[in-house]
């Protein structure tokens, strides 16, 4: 299993699939507001959750987080008012160099 070290502890990485119709049409200001809200909720939840990156597509946002478990990610979504339709633990990461 893929894990990152936070505070001396190995934490798993997760991908969150968020259904958000029209996500690809959100303005930079909209995305900044969503990001600010997410950062505030993360600060309130404590150091065991870390947002790494997000990918915005036409109707979904895929977010990559490091956290101890799925529960804190669903709590983050609830507190922030964000959808969290699918939360999946990452088993491995590959890239072109994997095939070399």
Task: Report residues per predicted region.
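Amphipathic, hydrophobic secondary-structure cores in small proteins
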Residues: 52-62
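Short secondary-structure capping/turn micro-motifs that flank functional sites
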Residues: 58, 93-94
């Amino acid at each position: 299993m893929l894990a990152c070290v936070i505070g001396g502890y190995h934490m798993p990485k997760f991908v969150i699939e968020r259904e958000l119709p029209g996500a690809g049409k959100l303005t930079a200001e909209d995305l900044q507001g969503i990001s600010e809200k997410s950062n505030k909720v993360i600060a309130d939840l404590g150091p065991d959750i870390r947002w790494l990156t997000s990918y915005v597509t036409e109707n979904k946002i895929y977010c990559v987080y490091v956290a101890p478990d799925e529960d804190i990610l669903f709590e983050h979504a609830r507190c922030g008012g964000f959808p969290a339709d699918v939360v999946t633990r990452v088993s491995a990461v590959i890239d072109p160099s994997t095939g070399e």
